[in-house]
Design a protein with these regions (language model features):
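Active-site beta-strand/loop architecture of penicillin-binding DD-peptidases
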Residues: 1-27, 43, 47-139
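Short, highly charged C-terminal tails/helix-capping segments
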Residues: 141-156
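Extended, non-catalytic substrate-recognition/exosite surfaces adjacent to catalytic cores, especially
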Residues: 17, 24, 28-30, 36, ...
Length: 156
């Protein structure tokens, strides 16, 4: 659903009481619900086994997203395969997203651990760290079994 933009969420008196609250208004549906569900299902595969962004998975939640990797243009034409922009845009819980975030890294450094920077192995882990903190701050309830850190490290 596309929401109408709002600048004010609420009017609050000096003593902290809420005088008036402004609820979100839906402007229109961007996609049919069935189409949106198909898109979320397809984007969940990106963070599943065999996907390009397993490193973006947050324990206790299904994450859906899309990776991006682009070579930067050379001044004289063509593309420089050593200079790239990588990204990951993700949402969680995937079934009913409460949080959406895009992480973009411009010319990430090549390292022994990441000799070929891509959206999934550079921006994915950053999304994960942000999403873990946001889940706590937003008090999001896990939608999947929570894996212990030991079980996660053993499964990798």
């Amino acid at each position: 659903n596309l929401r109408k933009p709002k600048i004010v969420r609420a009017l609050i008196a000096n003593d902290g009481t809420v005088v008036q609250k402004f609820e979100p208004e839906i402007a229109s549906n961007v996609l049919k619900p069935a189409t949106a569900k198909k898109m979320r299902t397809a984007l969940m595969k990106v963070t599943e086994e065999g996907g390009t962004a397993k490193a973006a998975v947050v324990s206790g939640f299904k994450v859906a997203g899309k990776t991006g990797t682009a070579f930067k243009a050379k001044p004289g034409g063509g593309y420089d395969e050593t200079r790239r922009i990588v990204s990951f845009v993700g949402m969680m819980p995937a079934e009913n997203p409460a949080f959406v975030c895009i992480v973009v890294a411009d010319e990430p450094k090549l390292t022994a651990k990441i000799p070929k920077p891509q959206g999934g192995n550079v921006a994915g882990p950053i999304f994960k760290r942000i999403a873990e903190r946001v889940a706590v701050r937003m008090n999001l309830q896990p939608t999947e079994p929570v894996k212990s850190p030991l079980a996660q490290s053993e499964s990798r």
